[in-house]
Every structure is written in structure tokens, then in C-alpha cells.
Amino acid sequence: MKSPAPSRPQKMALIPACIFLCFAALSVQAEETPVTPQPPDILLGPLFNDVQNAKLFPDQKTFADAMPNSDPLMILADYRMQQNQSGFDLRHFVNVNFTLPKEGEKYVPPEGQSLREHIDGLWPVLTRSTENTEKWDSLLPLPEPYVVPGGRFREVYYWDSYFTMLGLAESGHWDKVADMVANFAHEIDTYGHIPNGNRSYYLSRSQPPFFALMVELLAQHEGDAALKQYLPQMQKEYAYWMDGVENLQAGQQEKRVVKLQDGTLLNRYWDDRDTPRPESWVEDIATAKSNPNRPATEIYRDLRSAAASGWDFSSRWMDNPQQLNTLRTTSIVPVDLNSLMFKMEKILARASKAAGDNAMANQYETLANARQKGIEKYLWNDQQGWYADYDLKSHKVRNQLTAAALFPLYVNAAAKDRANKMATATKTHLLQPGGLNTTSVKSGQQWDAPNGWAPLQWVATEGLQNYGQKEVAMDISWHFLTNVQHTYDREKKLVEKYDVSTTGTGGGGGEYPLQDGFGWTNGVTLKMLDLICPKEQPCDNVPATRPTVKSATTQPSTKEAQPTP
């Protein structure tokens, strides 16, 4: 049912007002904002294109991460002079003028370690800093050490980090949690948002917005002081996601904001650039060329925006699951993103109240309530009985069930009866022997069946627990942990994703080989171990038999997590 006409303008006016207040509060920092670093494809122009197209390296990310040894303009000038000379060797030119990223030493864990001991031993192995960042490096400097995912991912990633931080907190490493929150706050202050990762070529997009949840996690240890300290950065990130809303008319979209015909405001994923991704240059060009019926720039934008979603790639964004060139991320309103935006608004309300600004707290509560109504109206498929994404082209909720449907439960935005239906749908369609399936579609893309990802296992587990669905939550945790344990027993490592159709097998598909390490798997595994085992009898390995719900911890524990006065 539509809202009464007189109240709508008043509600919508709150959002621009909030955004302007957020910017006003932070305007003192504007003069300190440095010039945005340019990505390597812009700095190096035709040289970058030629190197990537020559496929000098098996992974396109290698040259994107390479550091110029001198001014890129001088290197480019030298290249233009030399490239047509007889005997010119492109690989030699690259080796002379660039420092390539070093391959990390393969970590060999000590013999006889339990799963918990292995993870605790990995935190220092995965910790990095940017103390030695050079002027032309694509790596963006950060003030504090940080934990990377592992493998080819040599930098910090936005949404990965939240699930890594859950594990750091579980291990009692609150200093590392605080460092990572400080780093992300620094990025917001410096660039106006948190980029996909701390690389210049990631600056044109963000990722699922977990910063407010990171601050909330830190507040478990530091109390409301953390909420008050990082309120300005949370406000500034919210302004980034809502940028352009004040000029939107009904039925329009601007960057990351969507205004539906009835005035409902929701968000979508978006990348400010519409060119091939430097880290996947050749692959993106090939994808665009394979569909001549669409402008290449449109495909590039949708590829980049899918990377912003964290789900790169998935049938979720595609008209034809077998053809990546049919993806249209920017015309889809994602249920997980809008759940996170709801949670951001709720945490902003809490932080504003802690800071003594009740008027602002009430504004954020109003925004959260309006978004919750939008989620229930547009992102619920009543015919199927599950949450789903909204299609801006068909003006209908989509039919596909994905693990993203659990996000409204995770942030407590779901109606009770709908949460119960989600539990049934999850158990019927997504639960597999090795954990929760990402989707039920086999497309060959990594964010589809049969792959299961640690963050989605945790979101589902927590979300179902929030609504009393503890048996299904235990099933997910137990099946996924068994998969992790079996893989660890055989290979002595934790990996980025798992094949959930069985147990003990890493996942496949996507643009690169399976990566090990792995930050968010480590974090979620620790949280789940402490969830399924009683507090008085913590387990260091996954029990051989499924624990009963009564014997398990009723709420996830976090070491030393009591708020400090």
C-alpha cells in the first residue's frame, strides 16, 4: 500500500538533510584529501594494454600489481621510442622498468596442529603493512598493519575483512581488530569511501558495506567509545552510498542509489569507471567482444559492479547463466546490499544516540524503518517464499533463490513469518552435505553451485539463530565445519571456497585458481567452533558427531568481548 502523499516528501527530505550534515561535519578534512592515485591502466596507457594483451604473466593481476621503478610518464615515453625498434623485447622492457610482486613463501604448518592452532598460527603469517610503499606503487598506504586473505590477494579487501576480524576477536586479538577499523576509517577520510581493496585500481568502487558492523564489533570490546569515535566516518560512508539522492526523481537511478516509482529508496552496486578491470584486463575485453549486441562500456561497468558486490561472478547477475556477457549488475537491486544499508542506518542511529545527538538518531531510525518497508515490499518473492533481488528492467522481484536471501535475517530486518519460510527454503534448496550452496545454478562461475563460501555460511547461521531456527543453523555450521576439517586433515590448509556437494574438497570455477590462506574462512571457522561446542568444553577440532543444539553455545562467544566502561 502506498504511503499517504503528504508524508512522503517529509520522509524523503530526511535523506538529503542527513547527507549534507554528514559532509558538513567532515568538511574540515577536505583540504587534507590528497589527489586520488591513478590506476596503472591510466598511468601507463598503451604500455599497460600491450603487456596485458601479450599475456606475459599467467595472472593478469601480476602486472596490475607491478611497481614502476621510475616516473610512469618517463617509462611510457621510453616505450614509445623503443617499441618499434628491431629486436625489441617487451618482457625484457617490463623486467627492467618494473618490480614485479613477490610470490609469498608457502607456509608449512607445524606437524600435529589442531584446526584452531593452525588458524591462530596463521594470523601473523597473513599480516601485512605498507611501510615500504613507493610513490608509483598501486598499493595504497595504510597507517596500521592489516590481515590479508592470502594467495594472490596481497592487499586488504573490504568485506573479507569483517569475517577475518570476527576470527581475530575470537582469538583475542582486539589490537588487530582496532588496527583494521582504524585503517578503514583512514580510507574513508582519505578517499571518501572504502575501496574494494587498497589498490589504486580498486578506488572506483567499494564492496558490501560492513564498516559499521566492524565498528559495532569493536564496541563489544571498547563500549560506546568506539561508536562515538568512528561516527564521522560511518556518516561519511553513508553519504557515499547515498550520493546523488537529492536530485533523483521517481523511477531514476544515480550511481549507487535507486528511487522506485513510489519514492522508495534502495541501493545497487556501481563502479564509477566503464573500462576493463586492470586486474582482469584480457578477460574483460574478451567478455565484451563476445556480445557485440551490447556496448562494451556497459558490459565493463556491469563486470566492475559485480566485483563491487563481492559476487564476481554469479548467475545472480546474468540473464543467461552460461554467458557472462549477459550480466547486468547495475539493473538489479540486491537484497544483501540493502540489508547491510538497513544495518548501517541502525548502527548510525545507535552511535548518534551514544554521541548525545537524539535528533540525528531519530532521523537514522526513520531511514532504517523506511528501508525495512522497502525490503519487505520489493525484495520478498511471495510466490516462491523467499527473499530475492529486484529487477529494475522488469520491475519485478526476481525468482532465483541465493544465499544472499539470508541477509535480512542476519540484520534482523525480516518479518518472523518470512524468516520461518526462509528456514524452510534454505533447508530444502540450499543445504548440502558440505554446507550452504551459494545458488542452485551450475554456471561455472565461482559464486554459484556447487561452491560454498565462509561469509555466507556465517550470515545464514547467525540469521537463522536470530529467529530461533537453531536446528537449521546448526546443520549449516556442522556441515560446513566438517567440510573445512576434512580438507584441512588432507591438505593442512584452509581455502577460499569449498565444494559443498561433498566434504573435503575446495571449490572451483571463476577467473583464477583456488586460493589458500584464507582470511574469512579462518574467521568463520573459529566463530563456528565456538558456536557448536559448549563454552565449558571448547573444541579445537570439529567433533566427529553433530552436536545437539542444547549442548552448543546458545550465543557465539567472543573472547574478552565484554564492553569496557
Swiss-Prot record:
One of its GO terms (molecular function) is alpha,alpha-trehalase activity. HAMAP family: Peripl_trehalase. PANTHER family: TREHALASE (PTHR23403:SF1). GO terms for biological process: cellular hyperosmotic response; trehalose catabolic process. It comes from the Bacteria. InterPro entries: 6-hairpin_glycosidase_sf, 6hp_glycosidase-like_sf, Glyco_hydro_37, Glyco_hydro_37_CS, Trehalase_periplasmic. It comes from Escherichia coli (strain 55989 / EAEC). GO terms for cellular component: periplasmic space. It is an enzyme of class 3 (hydrolase). This is Periplasmic trehalase. PROSITE patterns: TREHALASE_1, TREHALASE_2.
